[in-house]
């Protein structure tokens, strides 16, 4: 349902050869006045990030929201995110919190935000961060932006990105994308949970973690950040490399356990 409260918005809807009933649902929006583009692929691209790139290129607006089809948002989500971005014109993107739900829509206790009391005491529930600091303290360590549906970003900042290799990735492209976006300006966080993030027992992320292919892309992202001129100390680099090594060990330990079973 298209129920967000934002005047002058448009929608670009893309489907990558879904095997469920997504196509029949999307076809209902063909005549909706707010749908500027509706494109359904006959073949799955194999990468959600290639879909991102196409959708962004088609968009004509000042701000972009990548609304994943399985997720949902409060009707005030876009209104509040855009208001914050208008208030802070030097920011690249606005990141909001999400409540997690399972495949059937039941709310889960999982909390990826884990906001501190200090964060929740900020004026107007807003935190502003220098992009470089945000990378060093958050995005270097993990894909801190765990849900793309919880972000609204400036198209102008996206257009300043020189390296678009994130879109050719299968698993870690979103992580690299947010790193590139943070390099284009400050980052604003709005400490309100206005999104629903659906977790699946089977997904590209789960498959990538099980196969080990996701770790290979994670290593590429970490090394890429370390190539920046940002001063990341030797001790922190060793800690980060240790985290990658631990994930590799867990993968092989899991494989060994499966062989024993």
Could you describe each region identified by the protein language model?
Residues 21, 71-84:
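Acidic donor-binding/catalytic loop of UDP-sugar-dependent glycosyltransferases
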Residues 74, 96, 114-214, 218:
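Conserved nucleotide-sugar donor-binding catalytic segment
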Residues 78-116:
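Conserved donor NDP-sugar-binding/catalytic core segment of glycosyltransferases
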């Amino acid at each position: 349902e298209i129920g967000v409260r934002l005047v002058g918005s448009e929608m670009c809807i893309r489907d990558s050869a879904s095997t469920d009933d997504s196509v029949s649902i999307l076809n209902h929006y063909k005549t909706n006045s707010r749908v500027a583009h509706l494109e359904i692929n006959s073949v799955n691209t194999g990468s959600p990030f290639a879909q991102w790139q196409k959708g962004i290129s088609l968009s004509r607006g000042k701000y972009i929201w990548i609304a994943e089809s399985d997720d949902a948002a409060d009707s005030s989500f876009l209104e509040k995110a855009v208001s914050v971005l208008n208030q802070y014109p030097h920011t690249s993107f606005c990141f909001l919190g999400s409540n997690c739900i399972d495949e059937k829509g039941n709310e889960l206790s999982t909390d990826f935000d884990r906001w501190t009391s200090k964060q929740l005491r900020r004026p107007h529930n807003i935190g502003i961060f220098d992009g470089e600091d945000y990378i060093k303290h958050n995005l270097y360590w993990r894909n801190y932006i765990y849900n793309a549906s919880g972000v609204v970003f400036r198209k102008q900042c996206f257009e300043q990105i020189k390296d678009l290799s994130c879109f050719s990735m299968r698993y870690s492209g979103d992580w690299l994308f947010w790193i590139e976006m943070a390099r284009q300006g400050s980052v604003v966080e709005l400490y309100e949970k206005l999104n629903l993030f659906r977790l699946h027992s089977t997904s590209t992320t789960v498959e990538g973690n099980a196969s080990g292919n996701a770790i290979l892309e994670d290593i590429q992202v970490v090394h890429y950040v370390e190539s920046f001129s940002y001063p990341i100390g030797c001790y922190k680099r060793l800690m980060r490399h240790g985290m990658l090594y631990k994930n590799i060990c867990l993968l092989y330990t899991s494989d060994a356990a499966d062989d024993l079973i």
